[in-house]
Amino acid sequence: MVMPVSPEPETSLCCAFCGRVLDVVVVNPTGELIGCEECAGERGLAGEVMTIEEWNAPAAVAEVLEQFGLSGWQAQKPAPSPAQQPRAHYWEVQSPGARYFLKRFYNWYPPASIRYMHSVMAHLANRRLPVPQWVPNSATGESFTEAAGANWALYRALDGRTATRQDWMWGRPKAAEMLASLHLELQDCLPEGEEFHPWGAWTLDTVDRVLESWQPHPDLPPELLGHVRDRLATRYFGELYPALPKLVVHGDYVAANILWKGDSMSATVSGVLDFERAHLDTALFDFAWGLGDRRPPLLRATIATYSRVRPLSAIEREAMPEALLLGALMGIDMQMTYFSDMDEVSRLAQELALMVRDTESLRKAAALK
């Protein structure tokens, strides 16, 4: 049964930690539900406080769907999954004979960047890859609309589920093949609009600025960070990066943005979501961010499945260990700066240290045999 936008008492939102019914919610910087204020505070999780009315936004949703020409619809927040909680800016929408999802963009994400991501998605959809197709505004034909002080987009929903951590381990080869297919088709993509520059390609200046902004952490000693910074400065940005092929990349090719069909052992990718971070970069960025692994056997296997669709060049293979180091810094920065999750920072810092230790083993794993 699909519930209406305004939840009935029996479907009231509850805190995942303490179970209490919520009249005020806390969401993380990506809009994902954390829980009540007390539980978020106890766990040191930073977030935005919203009322239930702001969370459901029934009047705004109704106004937006009218602009997209929908009638007889019902809307609800997506149900929790093993991969993620409901989000403040997503709704599932059912209308006669069709299913959609509705997205409200944050005000800091500009219209030119919405056009950019929608241009990338349209390019891939025209190449018959499984990405959401946006629905045009019924009056203007634009790929998004403005209402209630924000920009909104409506997409035709794709079937599938997100993977659990265990399913992701089994599915990584298939995910690598799909990423390679995306990269093949994006090599000639010239998007309209502008990429969102804060989420653009990292440079050495970005690395320096990020490292200077971090608070001291016991698992991130200066000598570790200094070694990584120097390695990136000389080996990656100095020697390899200028010669690496550049193309439009997805930007956030992680488990939460990939849909699957079938059981764990035979699952296939049925959808790739969330192109907000699409930008011009190296293919290694997507690979290192979403599929990179510090364990040489797993890295070798993932590279092999990717390369069956889009063979990695010799210089891409040579640069893989440094790309993994850069991706590790990005992951730490996200947890340090946006989520303030120091437990996850500790875990990722330990992974970084092991990656530094095993750099040459990773280089051998990436090399063409």
Range-by-range predicted roles:
Residues 24-34:
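Short linker/helix segments within small regulatory modules
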Residues 40-50:
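Short metal-binding segments enriched for Cys and/or His
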Residues 49-138, 262-267, 368-369:
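Conserved NTP-binding catalytic cores of kinases and kinase-like/nucleotidyltransferase enzymes
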Residues 84-97, 101-102, 134, 233-285:
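Active-site acidic catalytic loop and adjacent metal/ATP-binding pocket
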Residues 95-191:
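ATP-binding pocket architecture of kinase catalytic cores
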Residues 165-223, 246:
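A cross-family kinase active-site recognition segment
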Residues 201, 205, 213-214, 331-369:
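ATP/Mg2+ or Mg2+-diphosphate-binding catalytic cores
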Residues 280-311, 326-343:
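Active-site activation/catalytic loop segments of kinase-like enzymes and analogous catalytic loops
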